[in-house]
């Protein structure tokens, strides 16, 4: 008799029970791992799968997390074979090529499209009913690519979009007002990154519109220069990259925030990237961030934001830029 047999007597043969809220993270780079640890520490799933083409790095990361199993309630698995991801509820895609110095955005996009041509069909094969969350950059274009390659309905393909931009925005407004970010309500919509659109007309604390108190807010003529806050949001990522080489923690927490709303069916409103054709005068098949309701079925509703003419124009301009890139892609 083995030690195990002496210690434990078997009462019944266990039937394998599938995980009801399994999450997969594709890509174990800085963003993938920050997303994984954030999901684990929020206790969102009973199984977390990780997959990557870099076998040793993947093995090391999985092992490192498994060594902390005592402090977690989640089963952690990892493999370069996508069968490990089977029956996931949410699949978070963080994998992709990094932009090389002097490389055009379009070239980077096409390289990532080629990577997605391998990743997305594999996800669909093993988790045909999952909700796909794209985090890789440029996120709006790659969410469109994932939607096209997966054949999923639009409610099940979401881009992390401006959820992080809005969090940065609220943090900086909070710093200026000496308030917690959760008490500063503010939205950034549109394209994630350089051409994102801050909705100054909607910025409020306890329902008090800040633009009502300072009608010049967000414009060039504002003596308090609130506009600089949006510039800081846009420059924030570049600043972090300059200082530490990459961004990870905030985007990881942002991803876990979105996963939580889906897994727990919270019907929370988040600025995430979705198909905006027909909204705000956008004519093309593009994905941009608008306030959207997230729950168990993915993205169930979109909130109609009251945007000023200038803000709508910025959105349409982003849409045209994205479409210009998308129509050149070979899918």
Swiss-Prot record:
Active site (UniProt): 192 (proton acceptor)
Catalysis: reaction(s): (S)-lactate + NAD(+) = pyruvate + NADH + H(+)
Main localization (coarse): cytoplasm
Binding residues annotated for substrate, in chain numbering: 105, 137, 168, 247
Known pathway: Fermentation; pyruvate fermentation to lactate; (S)-lactate from pyruvate: step 1/1
One Pfam short name: Ldh_1_C
Known EC number: 1.1.1.27
A GO term from the CC aspect: cytoplasm
Broad enzyme group: oxidoreductase
Binding residues annotated for NAD(+), in chain numbering: 29-57, 98, 137
Domain of life, per lineage: Eukaryota
Compartmental location: Cytoplasm
Keywords tagged on the record: Cytoplasm, NAD, Oxidoreductase
GO terms for MF: L-lactate dehydrogenase activity
Similarity-based family: Belongs to the LDH/MDH superfamily. LDH family.
Name used for this protein in its record: L-lactate dehydrogenase A chain
């Amino acid at each position: 008799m083995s030690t195990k047999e002496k210690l434990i007597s078997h009462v019944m043969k266990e039937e394998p029970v599938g995980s009801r809220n399994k999450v997969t993270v594709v890509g174990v780079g800085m963003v993938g791992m920050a997303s994984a640890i954030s999901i684990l520490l929020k206790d969102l799933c009973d199984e977390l799968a990780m997959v990557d083409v870099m076998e040793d790095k993947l093995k090391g990361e999985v092992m490192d997390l498994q060594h902390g199993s005592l402090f977690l309630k989640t089963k952690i698995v990892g493999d370069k074979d996508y069968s490990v991801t089977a029956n996931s509820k949410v699949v978070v895609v963080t994998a992709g090529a990094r932009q090389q110095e002097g490389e055009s955005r379009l070239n980077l996009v096409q390289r990532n499209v080629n990577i997605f041509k391998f990743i997305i069909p594999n996800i669909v094969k093993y988790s045909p009913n999952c909700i796909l969350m794209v985090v890789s950059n440029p996120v709006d274009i790659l969410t469109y690519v994932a939607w096209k390659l997966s054949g999923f309905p639009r409610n099940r393909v979401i881009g992390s979009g401006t959820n992080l931009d809005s969090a940065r925005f609220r943090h900086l407004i909070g710093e200026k007002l000496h308030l917690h970010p959760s008490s500063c309500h503010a939205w950034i919509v549109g394209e994630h990154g350089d051409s994102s659109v801050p909705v100054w007309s909607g910025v409020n604390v306890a329902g008090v519109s800040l633009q009502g108190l300072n009608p010049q807010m967000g414009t060039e003529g504002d003596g308090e220069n609130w506009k600089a806050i949006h510039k800081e949001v846009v420059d924030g990522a570049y600043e972090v990259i300059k200082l530490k080489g990459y961004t990870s923690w905030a985007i990881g927490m942002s991803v876990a925030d979105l996963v939580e709303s889906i897994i727990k069916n919270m019907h929370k409103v988040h600025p995430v990237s979705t198909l905006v054709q027909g909204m705000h005068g956008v004519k093309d098949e593009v994905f941009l961030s608008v306030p959207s309701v997230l729950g168990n079925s993915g993205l169930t509703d979109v909130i109609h934001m009251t945007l000023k003419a200038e803000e709508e124009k910025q959105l349409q301009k982003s849409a045209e830029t994205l479409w210009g890139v998308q129509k050149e892609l070979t899918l």
